[in-house]
Amino acid sequence: MNIMHTERNGVTILSLRAERLDANNSDMVKDELKKLFAGGAKKVLVDLGEVRFIDSSGLGALVSGFKNAVAGRGRLTLSGLQSQVASMFELTRLNRVFDVFPTAEEAISSFAEQ
């Protein structure tokens, strides 16, 4: 997995460049999010636009990132969920925990509204 970092309007964007977020690479995402929030990041967007499959390990990595955000008084949002990934969020009801946006642009705009 390749994780691209960009920044736009004060929002750190992590673009996950992989078709799967699973047990093979979820620790990488978990560690990256932990490092960002420990370093003082307050606004983080994870763009899942290329991810076609997510398992419980991938969901766990994102939940861990969410907890790190809350602990650091920050905010973690998600964007670009493909249908199978969105279905997993709905099945686990994590769509009620995370702020999920269709596009990165909408997610970035949501940070300005708060």
How would you describe each model-predicted region?
Residues 100-114:
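A charged, well-structured terminal subsegment
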Residues 20-98:
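Amphipathic alpha-helical interaction surfaces in cytosolic regulatory modules
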Residues 17, 49, 105:
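Conserved catalytic submotifs in the C-terminal HATPase_c
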Residues 4-6, 79, 101:
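General small-molecule cofactor/ligand-binding pocket signal
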Residues 12-14, 19, 99:
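Structural signal for short hydrophobic segments within the conserved structured cores
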